[in-house]
Regions:
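Short catalytic helix/loop segments, enriched in acidic residues and glycine
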Residues: 19-32
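Short N-terminal binding/cap micro-motifs at the start of the first secondary-structure element
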Residues: 13-18
Length: 154
């Protein structure tokens, strides 16, 4: 089976992480008979540098045309002081989450019993190991909202 994957390499460590993830996917494909077609998509600081805005036209459409999106990392200190929303990498994250209808990030936390000594939890808890999945909701509240400033006469 062939899968179309949108690659958003992004900024900072993102290109390296995505590059290594592609190697893993290729190994999985060889073992299980899958093939992958990759489409590179610009988003974040690298998009600001290339086309002047963090969420270029066509980004959502390119991602929607694929079976999955592999996102590296977006943002960094180079772009952290821009005042215009289209020049801030995190606005691209909010936009793509909205446009793709994404609800949550899944953040696994696993502690193997062999690593108990490196954990700040009580020894009797850490020795049992931990296998926890955090679900971080993305669609509402202050986390998702746009930044605005209001000035009053008072």
């Amino acid at each position: 089976m062939n899968y179309k994957i949108a690659l958003i390499r992004g900024d900072g460590i993102g290109p390296e992480v995505v590059g290594e993830a592609v190697k893993v996917m290729e190994a999985i494909g060889e073992k299980f008979g899958h093939t992958f077609t990759y489409t590179d998509v610009l988003m974040g600081g690298c998009a600001i540098d290339a086309v002047g805005k963090s969420y270029p036209d066509g980004t959502a459409e390119a991602c929607k045309a694929c079976d999955a999106v592999l996102l590296g990392a977006v943002g960094g200190p180079k772009w952290g002081h821009a005042s215009a929303p289209e020049k801030r990498p995190e606005t691209a994250l909010l936009s793509i989450r909205r446009d793709l209808g994404l609800y949550a990030n899944l953040r696994p936390a696993v502690l193997r019993p062999a690593m108990a000594d490196a954990c700040p939890l009580k020894k009797e808890t850490a020795e049992k190991g931990i296998d926890l999945m955090m679900v971080r909701e993305l669609t509402g509240g202050i986390y998702f909202g746009k930044r605005d400033r209001y000035q009053t006469e008072d």
